[in-house]
Amino acid sequence: MRRTGPWDDAMRLALTEAQAALAADDVPVGAVVLDASGTVVATGHNTRESRHDPTGHAEVVALRAAAAARGEWRLSGCTLVVTLEPCTMCAGAVVLARVDRLVFGAYDDKLGAVGSLWDVVRDRRLNHRPEVVAGVLADESTALLDGFFARHRSAGLR
């Protein structure tokens, strides 16, 4: 039996959210916000295409839902688990929401802002720097994304 890491269950839930994005023909990225005890506060997936919203990234959707659920925009004590390394917008949202920990699956060498292209969350000029855990179930996240983009390329879409 394969040993699992401490973030695997939450990442599997994020992957389920990514599947929901895929079903809506959106880029399959999913996110989960956990409170300090590990309880799920909110989930989200990409809605950029379905809602015609440039800010409809899984991380932003989940952070908004978590803030609404908690009645507080400061998400101190929370962990954001997301299937893909956040972009600059989403990394900025993590910092601004005061999330304690960011856990992500696959690295994004085209848009990643948590170490790949930029490192927004570790920038010492900012007032908050969350802990980062990278590469959790990265192969599963990558396979989902690769399949999506291969289908879109072969169909001549986006």
Cite the ranges covered by each PLM segment.
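Zinc-dependent deaminase
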Residues: M1-A21, V40, M89-R158
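Small-residue (primarily alanine) positions within well-ordered alpha-helices
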Residues: A14, A18-A21, A31, A42, ...
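Short, flexible loop/turn motifs enriched in small residues
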Residues: A24-P28
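Short beta-strand scaffold segments in enzyme catalytic cores
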Residues: V29-G38
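Short beta->alpha transition motifs characteristic of CBS
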Residues: A42-R48
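Histidine-centered active-site/metal-ligand motif
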Residues: H45, H57, H128
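A short, polar/charged loop-to-alpha-helix boundary motif
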Residues: S50-V61, A65
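Immediate flanking context of iron-sulfur cluster ligation sites
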Residues: E72-L84
